[in-house]
């Protein structure tokens, strides 16, 4: 179950997302839900999206979901060369951290341009865990 993440992202709408590692692939299911459906989910712990609920049945075995953590990400992004630079400020479990991402159409080209960005601005590269994993690890240390 540690290879599963369920989140609800709120920006101009609410989007429930399941991310689950299956072999070498990452499965991702996204579904827009209303604020009312989200609030009901927080109250009753029943996943409102049937496809996600069915996908997690083998893990949950009828148990309800509880919200035990909040993770907020504030992102600024801008075009750079053939991609987009994104700078994230993440807040979770009494922690604030920052992350630099470079989104590109090709992996190799993006990797090359990312290395150029890091060198150009004197940034020390440090491979990071996914945000949700960092937040979960911080929560485990706290309890």
Specify the residue positions occupied by each region the protein language model found:
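Phosphate-end processing signature that detects enzymes handling 5′-triphosphorylated RNA
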Residues: 1-143
């Amino acid at each position: 179950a540690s290879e599963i993440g369920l989140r609800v992202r709120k920006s101009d709408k609410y989007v429930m997302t399941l991310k689950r590692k299956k072999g070498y692939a990452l499965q991702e299911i996204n579904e827009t839900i209303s604020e009312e459906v989200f609030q009901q989910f927080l109250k009753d712990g029943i996943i409102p999206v049937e496809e996600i609920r069915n996908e997690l049945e083998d893990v949950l075995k009828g148990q309800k979901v509880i919200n035990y953590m909040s993770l907020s990400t504030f992102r600024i992004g801008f075009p750079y060369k053939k991609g987009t630079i994104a700078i994230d400020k993440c807040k979770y479990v009494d922690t604030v951290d920052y992350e630099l991402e470079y989104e590109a159409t090709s992996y190799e080209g993006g990797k090359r341009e990312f290395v150029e960005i890091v060198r150009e601005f004197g940034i020390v590269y440090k491979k990071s865990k996914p945000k949700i994993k960092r937040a979960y690890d911080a929560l485990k240390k706290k309890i």
